[in-house]
Structure formats: C-alpha cells, structure tokens
Amino acid sequence: ALWKDLLKNVGIAAGKAVLNKVTDMVNQ
C-alpha cells in the first residue's frame, strides 16, 4: 500500500536524521 511505503520512507529518514545527530555529538 502507498501509505506503508510512505511510513517506511519517513521511518528511514527519521533514522538517518537521528544517526547523523548522534554522529555529530560524538565528533564534537
């Protein structure tokens, strides 16, 4: 279903954002 793909994409995007934020914190 379209909404499932949308939800998955949002979840992946959120996961990447969190990962980037954690990486920035570790690098500082």
From Swiss-Prot:
Function: Has antimicrobial activity.
Organism ancestry: Eukaryota, Metazoa, Chordata, Craniata, Vertebrata
Localisation per UniProt entry: Secreted
GO biological process, one term: defense response
Listed name of the protein: Dermaseptin-1
Signal peptide coordinates: none
Keyword Secreted: yes
Classification via InterPro entries: Dermaseptin_dom
Cited Pfam families: DD_K
Predominant localisation class: secreted
One GO CC term on file: extracellular region
Protein origin, superkingdom: Eukaryota
Tissue-specific expression: Expressed by the skin glands.
Modified residues (Glutamine amide): 28
UniProt keyword terms in alphabetical order: Amidation, Amphibian defense peptide, Antimicrobial, Secreted
UniProt keyword Secreted, yes or no: yes
Family: Belongs to the frog skin active peptide (FSAP) family. Dermaseptin subfamily.
Protein's organism: Phyllomedusa tomopterna (Tiger-striped leaf frog)
